[in-house]
A protein has these predicted regions:
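Acidic/glycine-rich phosphate/pyrophosphate-binding loops and surrounding catalytic core
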Residues: 1-212, 217, 226-234, 239-240, ...
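Glycine-rich beta-strand-to-loop/alpha-helix junction loops that act as flexible
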Residues: 220-221, 241-247, 265-267
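Active-site loop ensemble at the mouth of alpha/beta enzyme cores that anchors a bound cofactor
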Residues: 278-282
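Active-site glycine- and acidic-residue-rich loops that bind
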Residues: 138-140, 245-248
Length: 282
């Protein structure tokens, strides 16, 4: 089992445990165990669909006898009235899986919709939009899947798959040179093939990084577009570049036109509205 599927399965199991507990007594009390039925996933708001594959896993994990017919795949732009899928099976199973499936699909579709909006804003540039670790605890893998579905790029998944030397790391380490050198030594000692990114707060710090080298990407933290253009010129293509901090949808393209490779946007995952949809008997 790969790590991604393992995390998703654990999330599904936890979600069912917190929702159903010792039983869905409403459903169990009024719906016969033998009753069969169908429900459709009805889209009620325009956006980008995401989470269909996870929904299929939710149904299968709860009741493998449920049959799912998909009409619209992940990444497709949808509109009110669209039917994304129809699920057939025991009515008890349909009712007990409804809320978890909707919670996941609404959240993922909201993120994919927001990401698509940002990605379209960057069309015609060489800049890609990145997500961050500002995610819902326990749901990061799903939220980062949604970013990719929407056309964005995943930054690191967690603290384990990339070294990102931020301001606090630099300050506690005693400076940029010490932070970078210790990171390189650590990777060598541990046999870790990890990319190293460092955050800079001003041109002095940027010059220190350029003089020392040893990194893969440089993040410009809270730079204005004018500062960003100068910083990109200083880097001169030697390292990947990323803009972060204080960037809004309205200023996104201003930063992209400075020539940065990536722009990281926490809003893709930390303050997204779910896409409206419902699961109705049919």
């Amino acid at each position: 089992m790969n790590k991604e599927k393992e995390l998703i399965d654990k999330l599904i199991d936890l979600a069912f445990a917190e929702d159903i507990g010792d039983g869905d007594h409403t459903t169990l009390s009024c719906i016969p165990a033998t009753a069969m039925g169908k429900s459709k996933l009805l889209i009620k708001e325009a956006g980008v669909l995401a989470g269909i594959e996870v929904a299929k896993e939710i149904f299968n994990r709860f009741d493998p006898t449920m049959k799912v017919e998909v009409f619209i795949n992940d990444g497709t732009e949808v509109k009110p009235g669209d039917v994304a899928m129809v699920v057939e099976g025991k009515v008890q199973s349909l009712l007990q899986t409804e809320r978890l499936m909707l919670n996941v699909m609404q959240r993922m579709s909201g993120i994919a919709t927001m990401t698509r909006k940002y990605a379209k804003k960057l069309e015609g540039t060489n800049t890609r939009v990145l997500d961050t670790r500002k995610t819902t605890p326990g749901m990061r893998i799903l939220e980062k899947m949604a970013v990719k579905i929407g056309g964005g790029v995943n930054h690191r998944i967690g603290l384990f798959d990339m070294i990102l030397l931020k301001d606090n790391h630099v300050d506690f380490a005693g400076g940029i040179d010490k932070a970078i050198n210790r990171a390189k030594e650590y990777c060598k000692e541990k046999g870790k093939d990890l990319k190293i990114e460092i955050e800079v707060r001003n041109f002095d710090e940027l010059q220190q990084v350029l003089d020392l080298g040893g990194v893969d990407r440089i993040m410009f933290d809270n730079f204005t577009p004018e500062m960003t253009k100068k910083a990109v010129d200083m880097v001169a293509g030697k390292y990947e570049t990323e803009s972060s901090g204080g960037i809004t949808f309205d200023t996104l393209r201003d930063y992209a036109e400075c020539g940065v490779d990536f722009i990281s946007v926490g809003a893709l995952t930390h303050s997204v509205k779910g896409l409206d949809m419902s699961f109705k008997a049919c």
